[in-house]
């Protein structure tokens, strides 16, 4: 993996050097694009460099990895702005994923004493959710083979958004008011837990820390993450869930932008120059 500006060297000259000393050749050379700012390329002399370490310290490595892999097409240049990054974190991570996990675990705790129930009574929305959940792994794997990381993540988020819609369709809070609908409620809660378990596997190559946090809340942190398990939809029953702090707290965009501008700075640096001298003074200089 090299910058796109040095692909030629690493695909022609470097292999030739390796061949001359009979060393193994690289099987594939990948060139990544540039992350650009509104003023063009980042430059230390201009003082417009974004420090990834500071972003990780503030938002976590998983959030930054997700943004970079989801926002930019691998191999192409991409424009970076604080607004785009923060909105992506809020909408995708806090709203879609984080809220889904929090709501599901909270409902299992409230309506079934924190125990993931078995399937008892299925309806039409269940089959659609299961089909999307079990079919996502093959799509993600295919995109990964093509280094289409953004599309792979979009496939996972299609499942996440479908699961959020499933909550609105089934309305567990309404089912919980009618004891006669307990079997239906158990099935809904089970399906939600299964969908989240599936997500925890699918995001593992991209966001392993987040995956672990989700599995901890589902009570399966001690179980190995197996890719093929994402193609199954009946693996949970009897696990004790545990709600914890939000995986991705919602961000105040305006406040965060102010903090980021303080952290990174956006002013262009100019070199220091000495005061100019007159022609008469210059004539006095001995240049021998």
Positions of predicted regions on the chain:
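Beta-strand segments within the central parallel beta-sheet cores of soluble alpha/beta enzyme folds
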Residues: 28-31, 215-217
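Basic, alpha-helical terminal appendages of large translation-related enzymes
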Residues: 142, 147, 157-288
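Short active-site loop/helix that positions an aromatic residue
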Residues: 11-21
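Short, charged/polar, low-complexity loop and linker segments
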Residues: 77-82, 134-142
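Conserved, charged catalytic cores of large soluble enzymes
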Residues: 101-140, 160-181
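Catalytic adenosine-cofactor/nucleotide-binding cores of aminoacyl-tRNA synthetases and other
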Residues: 33-127, 218-255
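NTP-dependent nucleotidyl-transfer catalytic core
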Residues: 1-4, 21-27
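Secondary-structure capping and boundary motifs in well-ordered enzyme cores
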Residues: 3-6, 44, 55-56, 85-96, ...
